[in-house]
């Protein structure tokens, strides 16, 4: 998750929505989103 720029994702709805859907198991998982989901507790 070191390669994931959370500030960029949070500032851009086009990026944020797919990440949220991935975290909620509601959408396709992009590689970065999947990696973030695996490490979400450490990332936050």
From Swiss-Prot:
SUPFAM superfamilies in alphabetical order: Chemosensory protein Csp2
UniProt keyword list: Antibiotic, Antimicrobial, Secreted
Protein task: Has antibacterial activity against the Gram-negative bacteria E.coli and E.cloacae, but not against the Gram-negative bacteria P.aeruginosa, P.vulgaris, K.pneumoniae and S.enteritidis or the Gram-positive bacteria S.aureus, S.epidermidis and S.salivarius.
Protein family per UniProt: Belongs to the insect A10/OS-D protein family.
Pfam families per record: OS-D (PF03392)
Chief site of localization: secreted
Superkingdom of origin: Eukaryota
GO biological process: defense response to bacterium
Any one Gene Ontology cellular component term annotated for this protein: extracellular region
Protein name: Viresin
Intracellular or extracellular location(s): Secreted
Range of residues in the leader sequence: none
